[in-house]
């Protein structure tokens, strides 16, 4: 792979690996959140908890329109839409994920509550100020132009809307460069920003960071939202 994978390359990777990843992650495609080290929760409970944390940070109101940037199979969208009674549009660059999301969830939830489209966050097909909130769960990590993606997300959000992100970033000093290189190659990941770089980029694209929580010790991975 190149150091800057295209959306097509990322989509092809997920076409190949989505079924395997969802088998491991209890239907989701993101790490879990074990908030109590004394409690031995299952991966299903932990991944649902991470999704719930994201949904709660949106502070959404019933009936609002929310954008899911990198919706995977749609399971997170359904969980958040059901819990908060909002309408969610999910996008992905994987044809296989769109097929799964539409067949498994779109027709089995309240009419109009969730819908899924093939779309690239770096070229969103929505009008300005179309959504009341947005979230991205481990999807920005794949994008070769995060600045453009965040600028596009800001464009389609109404003033005052929230963006909740759960993602990976790289601390200074990689302990195992070979493992990291393999991760980049296998999962089509361009160079990752540091936490400070990500916060700076959010500010530069029009967002105000109101919370930054490090959950690496409770995720089984160096993951942060």
UniProtKB/Swiss-Prot annotation:
Reaction(s) catalysed by this chain's protein: desmethylrestrictinol + S-adenosyl-L-methionine = restrictinol + S-adenosyl-L-homocysteine + H(+)
Highest taxon of source: Eukaryota
Its EC number(s): 2.1.1.-
InterPro entries tied to this protein: Erg6_SMT_methyltransf (IPR050447), Methyltransf_11 (IPR013216), SAM-dependent_MTases_sf (IPR029063)
Keywords from the UniProt entry: Methyltransferase, S-adenosyl-L-methionine, Transferase
Purpose of the protein: O-methyltransferase; part of the gene cluster that mediates the biosynthesis of the tetrahydropyranyl antifungal agent restricticin that acts as an inhibitor of CYP51 and blocks the ergosterol biosynthesis. Within the pathway, rstn1 uses S-adenosylmethionine to methylate position C4 of desmethylrestrictinol to produce restrictinol. The highly reducing polyketide synthase rstn3, the short chain dehydrogenase rstn4, the cyclase rstn5, the FAD-dependent monooxygenase rstn6 and the enoylreductase rstn7 are required to generate the first stable intermediate desmethylrestrictinol.
Protein name: O-methyltransferase rstn1
């Amino acid at each position: 792979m190149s150091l800057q994978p295209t959306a097509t390359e990322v989509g092809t990777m997920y076409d190949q690996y989505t079924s395997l990843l969802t088998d491991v992650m209890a239907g989701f495609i993101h790490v879990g959140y074990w908030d109590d080290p004394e409690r031995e929760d299952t991966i299903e409970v932990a991944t649902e908890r991470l999704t719930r944390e994201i949904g709660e940070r949106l502070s959404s109101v019933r009936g609002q329109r929310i954008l899911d940037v990198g919706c995977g199979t749609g399971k997170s969208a359904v969980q958040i839409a059901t819990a908060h009674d909002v309408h969610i549009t999910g996008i992905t660059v994987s044809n296989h994920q769109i097929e799964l999301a539409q067949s498994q969830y779109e027709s089995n939830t309240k009419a109009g509550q969730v819908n899924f489209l093939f779309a690239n966050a770096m070229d969103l097909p929505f009008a300005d100020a179309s959504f009341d909130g947005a979230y991205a769960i481990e999807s920005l990590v794949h994008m070769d132009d995060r600045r453009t993606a965040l600028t596009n997300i800001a464009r389609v959000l109404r003033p005052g809307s929230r963006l909740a992100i759960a993602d990976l970033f790289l601390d200074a000093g990689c302990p195992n460069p070979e493992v990291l290189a393999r991760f980049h190659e296998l999962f089509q990941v361009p160079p990752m920003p540091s936490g400070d770089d990500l916060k700076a980029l959010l500010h530069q694209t029009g967002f105000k960071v109101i919370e930054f929580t490090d959950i690496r010790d409770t995720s089984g991975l160096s993951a942060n939202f």
